[in-house]
Structures are given as structure tokens and as C-alpha cells.
Amino acid sequence: MMTPGGSGRLRPLPTAMYAGYSGTASSWVAKTSVSASGKRIQREMAELNIDPPPDCSAGPKGDNLYHWIATIIGPSGTPYEGGIFFLDIIFPSDYPFKPPKLVFKTRIYHCNVDTAGDLSVNILRDSWSPALTITKVLQAIRSIFLKPEPYSPALPVIARLYLTDREKHDEVAKEWTLRFAK
């Protein structure tokens, strides 16, 4: 970009004044503005940093605002006690109108988490509302460590064991926690 110089010649503008500009007004807006979903995610990130839920943390992976990594510490008194569980959080471009996708990266023996790490919890499906936040989602996921939802399982075989032989279920869940989450 050029500006008129004192001698009638054009001189270049300082680079910082047009960083991100590629020649059209629309490209300037695309590179310098944050979408409504991005602003919402930034606000939730700030709130999460100020007041995180118990045993939970989360934040962007690198500089991608729409891809986060979360950590949940297994609550005491559960077969997951002391385990460190990592999750990927992917926010859709139309967040919060669509729920984020959460995937366990740490293997876990749980009826609401399938073998690929995908969760089967109502808050991320039928119960989703734009009023919910990532803090509420993390709290809901932590709550399934305390009280699994065996009647809406991702893995029915684990749900069946949970309902019919809780002691054996908890023994296997503890073994997995020691093996994969410590």
C-alpha cells in the first residue's frame, strides 16, 4: 500500500499498518476479526482460567482456538482415582449452537466411553443448549467418573458388568487406570 509523499511520489506505508491485508476489504476482515464463536470460546477460556472445575483443566492446543486439550484427574473414591485423563476438545465453527466434540485420548474402562474415546453423554447430544459452557461440559464428564450412565452406554458390555457385578467392573477399571492413566 502506498500513501502520497511530500514530493508527489507515493511512499510505502509501514508494514505493521497493513499486516494481514491481502488486497481486498473482505480478506482484511477475515484475517483480523474474531468470529462470534471465537469470541465465545475466548470468553469461556478466560472464565475457565479464573474458576476451573475441580480436578479439570483445559486450553487451546497451540494457537488453534477451536482445538483444545483437557485434563481430568480421576476423583478419589472411584476406580479412576488419581488417573490423569486427557481429552481433545474440538469446537465447531457454529459453537455454541452445536456442541463441542470431546474424545478421550487416554484409554479408559467406562461404559460411557467407546474404544475410540468417543463419549456417550446426554449433555453432548440431546441435552445440548447454547447456554452450556465448556466448564459445564467438563463438570458433566467428571460426574460420569463418579456416577456412570449405564442406561445410555457407549459400550453395553461394560454397562452390563457395571450393573451385574460392580466389584468386578471396578477392579477392571482400576487396572486400566493404573495401566493407561498413571
Curated annotation (Swiss-Prot):
Keywords linked to the UniProt accession: Nucleus, Phytochrome signaling pathway, Ubl conjugation pathway
GO CC entries: nucleus
Effect on the protein of changing residue 78 to I: In COP10-4; induces an open cotyledon phenotype due to defects in photomorphogenic repression
Domain of life per record: Eukaryota
Keyword field contains Cell inner membrane: no
SUPFAM superfamilies the record matches: UBC-like
GO terms for biological process, alphabetical: red, far-red light phototransduction; regulation of photomorphogenesis
Location within or outside the cell: Nucleus
Residue ranges of every copy of the UBC core domain listed in the record: 36-182
Sections of the chain in a coiled coil: none
GO molecular function: ubiquitin-protein transferase activity
Family named by the database record: Belongs to the ubiquitin-conjugating enzyme family.
Function: Component of light signal transduction machinery. Involved in repression of photomorphogenesis in darkness by participating in the CDD complex, a complex probably required to regulate the activity of ubiquitin conjugating enzymes (E2s). Repression of photomorphogenesis is probably mediated by ubiquitination and subsequent degradation of photomorphogenesis-promoting factors such as HY5, HYH and LAF1. Although strongly related to ubiquitin-conjugating enzyme, it has no catalytic activity by itself due to the absence of the conserved Cys active site at position 120.
PANTHER family: UBIQUITIN-CONJUGATING ENZYME E2 (PTHR24068)
Subunit comment: Component of the CDD complex, at least composed of COP10, DET1 and DDB1A. Interacts with E3 ubiquitin ligase COP1. Interacts with E2 ubiquitin conjugating UBC5. Interacts with CSN3, CSN4 and CSN8 subunits of the COP9 complex.
Name of the protein in its database record: Constitutive photomorphogenesis protein 10
Organism: Arabidopsis thaliana
Classification of source organism: Eukaryota, Viridiplantae, Streptophyta, Embryophyta, Tracheophyta
Gene: COP10
